[in-house]
A protein has these predicted regions:
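Feature of Fe-S/electron-transfer and energy-metabolism proteins
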Residues: 1-618
Length: 618
């Protein structure tokens, strides 16, 4: 593909997809017919830069319409946004869900990550590839976790076409999308050939074995409330927290969140109240709120269940966070592999806006706030907050060096507070119960309830809500752990393994830290003795190799060297593997000490724990 403006022209379909998002072009500079006005003015400077953030939605519009992004389509989008084609090409090729090469309109994504691999995903792929040949009009792609681990193995079918191309910045609802989970060869082939006739997904409540249980603080409405009905949400306590927030005022809300001891639920466990206070106190304006719903850690699916089962709770929580921090505009960065969550959140935001719960005068309080959805496109690295900012702004999703920190210079260079879905939803019980009552749940250092994503060798996989302090063994017993347990992976691919004799580890940030492991985002993946550990470790190494953004040498090179070493020792043990294990340790230390962001810093964790705790390759 030529990296400059060329002679390639967009098709009528491509032009229509872009124009549906951006509106019709105003001049020949943007691709319209030439007029006398073109001799007198051209959009540039600030006006051009202010539209750069529409690049990602524009790429989605093209990819959704045709299934790939052609040179002519990319050129037209670049002219409309005044973005150099070379930069737009770099953005388009950064994301796994986009293609800049021709491919069939239907793509079958089969998860081959940890939970699905243990459930037979490799055999599923082979069967699908054998039955969906070149003449089928379907591309079969093996890929990372789809966030459907409780129903492994999982597959996602996406069909491009006019109905699939959205005309919103969020990318629109990918209507011709079908989820098959648990997937069988027959089911995925049927879904791939006729996704519009695929069976409906099961309700989100099936991913919550404890549901319906109104006593749950975070999951109590899942399975009880109609996720599409705002009135039903309000009848079950919805918007009580926002009304209390208005009564407290911004400073009072921050004080309540601080006193509750709420820590971020994304893995870093940073105090939420401190982050909000730091953002609110910044003199530079405007302030922004970003909700990170791009959960891509293998084994994680809690945010999907919350958005599918209780979407208005997230809208309310984002509104409270914006009120407290002085933000007037919020972005919900939602994972591209979550079509139903996207549909539910778009509907919830539209209904809230129509009922005066978003917009210029929320609940008549003189507070203005609105939410815009940005759909991700398959990049694990965009879970890192500064990479996510770059993605929203229309650049490659590469992490930024810190400082400056996001509370000072975040999205668009302005003070920004970024929280994930679970963290924000925890704010609701903080305000409805009060800080002291909330802090009484859990432990002194880890307060409140926590969501755990349990999958693998258990009879009842799903999302579990438990107070901090419950042990790993108690959680696995609740989930029905099977006989022959060999290891448990805590925190996903970036986490660590523990042995079956370590199930008394308390599930708190401080408890897992003292045990030499991590709680991470709440992934708890059980593996029995039928799962080959070397193959599991190799898949983790492949995952980090694929997902490294390549910006820094320690991660770019280290993840490849780690995978190469694991390939070499896959069939060796003991002394034969000693040299490569020594190399792995050296590479792992280099990645941990010198990588820019958490991806490289944690890429060695699971492999290290398997060697040291499980005796892998002995």
């Amino acid at each position: 593909m030529d990296l400059r403006f060329g002679d390639s022209r967009p098709t009528d379909e491509e032009r229509a997809a872009v124009d549906a998002l951006l509106g019709p072009p105003e001049s020949s500079w943007e691709g319209a017919d030439r007029s006398d006005a073109d001799l007198r003015w051209a959009r540039g400077g600030r006006a051009a830069r202010d539209r750069r953030d529409l690049l990602l939605p524009g790429l989605h519009a093209l990819n959704d319409r045709l299934g790939w992004i052609s040179e002519g389509g990319l050129d037209y989008l670049c002219r409309r946004l005044t973005v150099p084609p070379s930069e737009a090409y770099g953005v388009a090729t950064f994301y796994a869900l986009f293609s800049v090469r021709p491919r069939p309109a239907t793509v079958l994504h089969v998860c081959t990550d940890l939970a699905c691999a243990a459930a037979g995903a490799p055999r599923l792929c082979e069967a699908a590839e054998a039955r969906l040949g070149p003449e089928s009009g379907v591309t079969v792609e093996r890929g990372p976790c789809l966030g459907l681990c409780e129903r492994a193995p999982a597959a996602l079918v996406v069909r491009a076409g006019e109905d699939a191309a959205g005309a919103t910045a969020g990318g629109g609802v990918t209507r011709a999308a079908a989820v098959s989970a648990p997937a069988t060869p027959d089911a995925v082939v049927r879904a791939a050939l006729t996704p519009e006739n695929a069976p409906e997904e099961p309700p989100a409540a099936l991913a919550v074995p404890q549901a319906p249980d109104p006593g749950l603080l975070l999951l109590g409405r899942v399975g009880t409330v109609d996720p599409a009905d705002l009135d039903d949400y309000r009848a079950h306590g919805g918007y009580t927290a926002l009304r209390r927030a208005f009564a407290l005022g911004p400073a009072g809300v921050i004080r309540e969140v601080t006193d509750s001891g709420l820590l971020g639920r994304g893995g870093a466990a940073f105090p939420t109240g401190r982050k909000w206070q730091a953002t609110a106190s910044q003199p530079d304006h405007p302030h922004y709120l970003v909700c990170n719903a791009d959960e891509s850690e293998p084994g994680t699916f809690k945010d999907r269940v919350l958005m599918e089962g209780d979407p208005y709770a997230l809208v309310e929580a984002m509104t409270i966070a914006a009120y407290a921090t002085g933000a007037r505009h919020g972005y919900l960065y939602l994972r591209g592999e979550y079509p139903r969550a996207l549909e539910r959140m778009e509907h919830a935001i539209a209904q809230a806006r129509a009922r005066g719960l978003l917009g210029d005068d929320v609940l008549g309080q003189g507070f203005s706030f609105d939410i815009e959805i940005r759909r991700g496109a398959g990049a694990y690295i965009c879970g890192e907050e500064t990479a996510l900012f770059n993605s929203i702004e229309g650049f490659r999703g590469e992490p930024r060096s810190k400082p400056p920190f996001p509370v000072e210079k975040g999205l668009f260079g302005k003070p920004t507070v970024a929280n994930n879905v679970e963290t924000l939803v925890n704010v609701l019980p903080v305000l409805t119960l009060g800080a002291q009552a909330y802090a009484a749940i859990g432990t002194g250092a880890s307060t409140g309830p926590k969501l755990f994503c349990v999958s693998g060798s258990v009879d009842r996989p799903g999302i579990y809500e438990l107070p901090f302090g419950a042990t790993l063994g108690e959680l696995l017993t609740l989930a029905g752990v099977r006989d022959g347990l060999r290891a448990v992976l805590l925190g996903g691919a970036a986490g660590g393994f523990v042995r079956p004799d370590e199930l008394d580890i308390p599930l708190t940030f401080e408890g897992t830290r003292e045990a030499g492991t991590t709680l991470g985002s709440g992934v708890v993946m059980a593996f029995d003795d039928t799962v080959p550990l070397p193959r599991l470790l190799l898949r983790i190494a492949e995952f980090f190799r694929d997902e490294s953004c390549g910006q820094c040498v320690p991660c770019r090179v280290g993840t490849v060297r780690q995978e190469e070493a694991l390939h070499r020792i896959a069939e060796r043990t003991g002394a034969d593997a000693a040299a490569d294990i020594t190399l792995l340790r050296e590479v792992g230390r280099a990645m941990r000490d010198a990588s820019i962001c958490g991806l490289g810093q944690t890429a060695w964790n699971a492999v290290e724990s398997a060697i040291d705790r499980l005796g892998a390759y002995e």
